[in-house]
Structures are given as structure tokens and as C-alpha cells.
Amino acid sequence: GAAPDKPTLIFMHHPPFETGIWWMDSLGILDGLDRLATVLGRHRQVVGMTAGHLHRTIHATFAGVPVTVAPTTCYAVDLDIHDEALPKVTDEPSAMMLHYWHVDTLVSHTLFLDAHETYDVTGLMKDWPGRFERMRQRQPMPKALGSIE
């Protein structure tokens, strides 16, 4: 509340919503969510929330605020949203999120940590130097120049 005009992020361990993974939800902070929603309603400068606990990427909203749940850096909680689902983990790839504030927008990227190849596609494009300059200047890309040939 000390800086109501400054965009603010909230980081917390447990997500402020039910995920559908009952056995993880039962370990969360489901009590008091109405009070948290009231606080967020008074603080419109909160532009995003990030949580963990679930070991899997989830996107939702709570009280009108976008919420991301960070992916796993070790094992992932198995995505099984049936009421009788047994608690399980899986060996999905490890990942992390990078949150980037750009002008007036929160941008969140997910980066997989396992080794993977990258490929330079500039050799497949006509007039790469011209395209590069247009992109750097944030100019619209004519459709004929926007495709890979």
C-alpha cells in the first residue's frame, strides 16, 4: 500500500486457488482466500502473483490477478484431476520461469532446463539483413517478407 502507483508482484509458496490435483490442494492455503481477495481488491497495483508448491506450470487468475505457478526443477506432480487419483510424480523435464517487466506488461517465459538444440533459421529467410533492420525498428513486416522461403 505504500506505493499504490508502482506495479507490484506477489511471490508465495502455495497457489491461492484449487488446482484440481486434490492431494496437493489439501496441503495448500485454501483457508483465508476470501481475505486475500479483499486485500487484492484494495491494491490494484498488484499486476501478478507467482507461486510454487505444485512442481508443474499452471496459469490461472485469482481476484482478477494473473497467477503463474512455477514449473518443477526436479520431479513434477502428475497431472491427474480425478477425485480418486493416487498421489504420483512424473519425470517431466525440469524448467524455470523468467518474469520480465516490459514497459507496462508482465511477460513470463518458461525455459526448459534439459539440454536441447537450437537452430539458426536466418539462412532460410530472404534478405535477412533487411528483415533484421525492420524487426529492430519494430516496423511491420510485409507479408511477403514474413515467411520462410
Regions found by a protein language model. Name each.
Residues 1-68, 128, 132-143:
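His/acidic metal-ligating clusters that form di-metal
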